[in-house]
């Protein structure tokens, strides 16, 4: 019995768990390597570089496109040649790069003056302009009638006409400030007094002047 135990100790066997771990370690490197993408018209040379070629549909012959450092560069060269030969019907390696996102239409550059007028806000309304009121038409007409009576030969009561003429109210010119209104009113009063004195003197001389 002792001899049998000694033989087992001298020749131990590997446990089954260790054997399965060794098998999984052997398959692990293959899983870590990324799968290479296959591109149209691209082949890898034995020395590692990538060659691109395309078939000309008109001549039915292969066209050499060149040798590139990476497979992506060779695939892009094939896409450019395929668009040249077949147009939009060509099957590409990177269709998203060629077509791209849908472009939105933009407004063309307008002249500077037009763009500024479009962007500038509307002008603000200015302050209300102060308009001066002219003498009433009735007052001007009365003055004209009075002048015509003086030049005519009709005998009228000038004193009565002048009293009724200047007793009528009239509007003074409006201005933006109260001071200007006061000065204008004073000037108008002075002019009115001068006219009354002149007309009274003229009426007095008219009646006292001896007639033939």
Swiss-Prot record:
List where Basic and acidic residues composition bias occurs.
17-34
Question: Highest lineage ranks of the organism?
Answer: Eukaryota, Viridiplantae, Streptophyta, Embryophyta, Tracheophyta
Matching InterPro entries? AP2/ERF_dom (IPR001471), AP2/ERF_dom_sf (IPR036955), DNA-bd_dom_sf (IPR016177), ERF_plant (IPR044808)
DNA-binding region, residue range(s): 38-95
Role played: Transcriptional activator involved in the regulation of plant development and tolerance to abiotic stresses. Acts as positive regulator of tolerance to waterlogging stress. Delays waterlogging-induced premature senescence by regulating stomatal closure and antioxidant enzyme activity. May function through ABI1-mediated abscisic acid (ABA) signaling pathway. Involved in tissue reunion of wounded inflorescence stems. Required for the division of pith cells in the reunion process, which is dependent on polar-transported auxin and the wound-inducible hormones ethylene and jasmonate.
Q: What induces it?
A: Induced by salt stress. Induced drought stress, jasmonate (JA), salicylic acid (SA), abscisic acid (ABA) and ethylene. Down-regulated by freezing stress. Induced by wounding in the flowering stem. Induced by waterlogging.
Report residue spans for region: Disordered: 1-49, 96-136, 169-212
Q: What is this protein called?
A: Ethylene-responsive transcription factor ERF113
Gene Ontology terms: cellular component: nucleus
**UniProt keyword annotation of Transcription present:** yes
What species was this sequence derived from?
A: Arabidopsis thaliana (Mouse-ear cress)
* UniProt similarity note: Belongs to the AP2/ERF transcription factor family. ERF subfamily.
Q: Which GO terms describe its molecular function?
A: DNA-binding transcription factor activity; transcription cis-regulatory region binding
- Gene name for this UniProt entry: ERF113
Q: Where does this one sit in the cell?
A: Nucleus
Its main localization is nucleus
């Amino acid at each position: 019995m002792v001899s049998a135990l000694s033989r087992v100790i001298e020749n131990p066997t590997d446990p089954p768990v260790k054997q399965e771990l060794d098998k999984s370690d052997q398959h692990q490197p293959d899983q870590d390597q990324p799968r290479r993408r296959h591109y149209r018209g691209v082949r890898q040379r034995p020395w590692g570089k990538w060659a691109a070629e395309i078939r000309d549909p008109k001549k039915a012959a292969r066209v050499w496109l060149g040798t590139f450092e990476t497979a992506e560069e060779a695939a892009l060269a094939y896409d450019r040649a395929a668009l040249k030969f077949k147009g939009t019907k060509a099957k590409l390696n990177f269709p998203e790069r060629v077509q791209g996102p849908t472009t939105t239409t933009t407004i063309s550059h307008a002249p500077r003056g037009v763009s500024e007028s479009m962007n500038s806000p509307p002008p603000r309304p200015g302050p209300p302009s102060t308009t001066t009121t002219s003498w009433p038409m009735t007052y001007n007409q009365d003055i004209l009638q009075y002048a015509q009576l003086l030049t005519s030969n009709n005998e009228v009561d000038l004193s009565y006409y002048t009293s009724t003429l200047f007793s009528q109210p009239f509007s003074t010119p409006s201005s933006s400030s109260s001071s200007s209104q006061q000065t204008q009113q004073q000037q108008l009063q002075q002019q009115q007094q001068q006219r009354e004195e002149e007309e009274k003197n003229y009426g007095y001389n008219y009646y006292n002047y001896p007639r033939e």
